[in-house]
């Protein structure tokens, strides 16, 4: 099972990726983890990537694709792999196609943006214990206070509404076009393209997992 998982930030990709990887016995691969591992291992590609990152620059698509090819040749990818957050742009998808990286499925977890904003901007946490709450779905007994200690809850910068909206704008501009890219490719060239499936990412975690596994069995 070789697949790409697509979806906006806050769509619940990480949770579903864990279930899918467990079910198929495949590793979850994110470009961040892959870069860190290559740099740590000191591979030639890792050294190149480190030099670029140390200079404060973005790692080129060519270098990322070479890292991807290296990574999926590892023994733990024998049964397949799941890409999370890659490709992020059309040029990366084109480069992956040109490099002959074979895929079985592209699965999109679709959640309306207003639901994502509500989901993320409502999160609150108690930093000392790691306890988390949600103002609507899992509120504390006393507004703004931790249930156990009574201490103030915080809202992480990443969860502030403006930050969430900005991340969704970047996703719309850069990554959302991949939905069109892969669905069109599947329609026009079904023999070579990965199967494209979209599922709703609203509902309970169990419901979404059932939808995801059903889509990948189809």
From Swiss-Prot:
Its EC number is 2.7.4.3. Disulfide bonds: none annotated. One of its GO terms (cellular component) is cytoplasm. ATP binds at residues 10-15, 123, 132-133, 203. SUPFAM superfamilies: P-loop containing nucleoside triphosphate hydrolases. Residues 122-159 are annotated as: LID. It is found in: Cytoplasm. This is Adenylate kinase.
